[in-house]
């Protein structure tokens, strides 16, 4: 059983050009023009800073790997277009974190919608 779960809601989506760094010290760099979803949760919500480079990678329906990039206040998750996630369908365990029970139908997450199951 997970020790805790995080429930968060996307607050906005932004199209970033290729080569744009996200997070402290450029934790993630866009390799192409990408939509990024912003979730208002992070270290201030007691997510350990040790998770910074150890958070799981999420696999999407099209097989693309998505990286969660926490910063002081936010989690960033790649999105395919405004107001639409790529539909997280499974989890992959990481060293100190996992994503669990996210369901199979998250294709349409708008600001105010919820994503659950990030655990450590």
From Swiss-Prot:
Q: Which Pfam families match?
A: Ala_racemase_C (PF00842)
Q: What does this protein do?
A: Highly specific to D- and L-alanine and does not catalyze the racemization of other amino acids.
> Catalytic center at which residues?
24 (proton acceptor)
Q: Characterize the pH dependence.
A: Optimum pH is 9.5 in the direction of L to D, and 10 for the reverse direction.
Cross-referenced SMART domains? Ala_racemase_C (SM01005)
The UniProt record lists the EC number as: 5.1.1.1
Which biological process terms from the Gene Ontology are attached to this UniProt entry?
A: chiral amino acid racemization
**Quaternary structure and partners:** Homodimer.
Provide the protein name.
Alanine racemase
Provide the temperature dependence entry: Optimum temperature is 37 degrees Celsius for both directions.
Which family is this protein grouped under?
A: Belongs to the alanine racemase family.
Q: What class of enzyme is it?
A: isomerase
Organism expressing this protein natively: Penaeus monodon
Keywords per UniProt: Isomerase, Pyridoxal phosphate
What is catalysed by this protein?
L-alanine = D-alanine
Cofactor dependence? pyridoxal 5'-phosphate
One Gene Ontology MF term = alanine racemase activity
């Amino acid at each position: 059983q997970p020790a805790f779960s995080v429930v968060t809601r996307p607050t906005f989506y932004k199209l970033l050009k290729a080569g744009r760094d996200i997070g402290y010290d450029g934790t993630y760099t866009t390799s192409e023009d990408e939509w990024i979803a912003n979730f208002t949760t992070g270290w201030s919500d007691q997510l350990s800073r040790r998770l910074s480079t150890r958070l799981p990678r999420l696999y999407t329906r099209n097989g693309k790997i998505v990286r969660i990039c926490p910063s002081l206040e936010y989690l960033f998750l790649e999105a395919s277009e405004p107001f639409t996630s790529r539909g997280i369908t499974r989890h992959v365990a990481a060293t100190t974190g996992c994503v669990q029970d996210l369901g199979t139908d998250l294709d349409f997450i708008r600001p105010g919608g919820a994503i659950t199951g990030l655990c450590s």
